[in-house]
Regions:
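Non-Sec secretion/translocation targeting segments of pathogen effectors
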Residues: 1-15
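LRR N-terminal entry segment and analogous cap-like coil->beta motifs
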Residues: 35-96
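C-terminal capping segment of individual leucine-rich repeats
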Residues: 60, 70, 80-83, 90, ...
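Conserved hydrophobic beta-strand positions in leucine-rich repeat
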Residues: 67, 87-89, 108-110, 129-133, ...
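Consensus "Asn ladder" position of solenoid repeat domains
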Residues: 72, 92, 113, 136, ...
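Canonical leucine-rich repeat
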Residues: 77, 97, 118, 141, ...
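Leucine-rich repeat domain C-terminal region
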Residues: 219, 233-267
Length: 267
């Protein structure tokens, strides 16, 4: 299923409204980082760090909100990214990303890297709403404190467990193609799409998703669906194919008043 782009235009917000006191420091760090490419295995593409450093400097000086560093084969995180609200680092070779102090960050895309760990923004003023990090090597993530998140996609990783009870504004959640055996989501009144397909789930916890439009739980190990019937009132797409469902309660089908696509085959 094609995921919507997370790099839509965001509201103007000058990154220069509150200039960093340590601006000179991070620019010096950026120059130092640029010269370290040979020590980090990037000698085969020495121009990549030069290009990244140039983009960061130009974007900052021209007061841009977003920075695109995709496809530069980077193996380490460049300095200076805390100045931007939207960061695109798709198609690199990063194994770790630290956004702990990125208070301005709203949208982050780290698709198709080699991520094994990530630190998300922390604190009271965190405003991040969109995170996409499909096609990585993540086993564990902690987004439970990201109360402002509305879009989260971490498909094609190695996640075994996810907890996101505090993400009350979540609208889009894609955790397909992982190793999930359990997920604790809590009540999500804003959730519209939930994709948990291609995992190892044996059951689903009771939780309230009153506005859920699309539920994809195919290709798991589910023997039953323990969800409140009220979750299905607005469902238009439900795919529970390729599980181990033994009995389908016909009473459950009466709640699918809005259904347009239903798959229960191979159970």
């Amino acid at each position: 299923m094609k995921s919507p782009s997370i790099f839509n235009k965001i509201k103007p917000q000058s990154i220069q409204q509150h200039p960093e006191k340590n601006q000179l420091n991070w620019m010096l760090e950026l120059n130092k980082w640029k010269e370290e490419r040979i020590l980090t295995g990037e000698i085969h593409r020495p121009e990549c760090r030069n290009e990244a450093a140039e983009r960061i400097s130009c974007a900052f000086l021209s007061k841009q909100n977003d920075i695109d560093l995709s496809g530069l084969n980077l193996t380490t995180q460049p300095p200076g990214l805390q100045n931007f609200t939207s960061i695109n680092l798709d198609n690199n070779q990063l194994t770790h990303f630290d956004a702990t102090n990125y208070d301005r960050l709203v949208k982050l895309s780290l698709n198709s890297n080699a991520l094994e760990s990530i630190n998300f923004p922390q604190g009271r003023n965190v405003s991040i709403t969109h995170i996409s990090m499909n096609n990585n090597c993540l086993r564990n993530i902690d987004i439970d404190r990201l109360s402002s998140i509305t879009y989260f996609s971490a498909a094609h990783n190695q996640l075994e467990f996810v907890q996101l009870e505090s993400c009350e504004w979540l609208q889009y959640l894609n955790l397909s193609h992982n190793q999930l055996t359990d997920i604790i989501a809590g009540n999500k009144e804003e959730l519209l799409l939930l994709d948990l397909s291609h995992n190892k789930l044996t059951s689903l916890h009771n939780a309230l998703f009153p506005n859920l439009n699309t539920l994809l739980i195919n290709n798991n190990l589910l023997s039953e669906i323990k969800m409140f019937y009220s979750n299905f009132c607005n469902i238009q797409t439900l795919n529970a194919a390729n599980n181990q469902l033994e009995n389908i309660n016909l009473h459950f089908l009466t709640y699918l008043s809005s259904i347009k696509s239903l798959r229960l085959d191979n159970n």
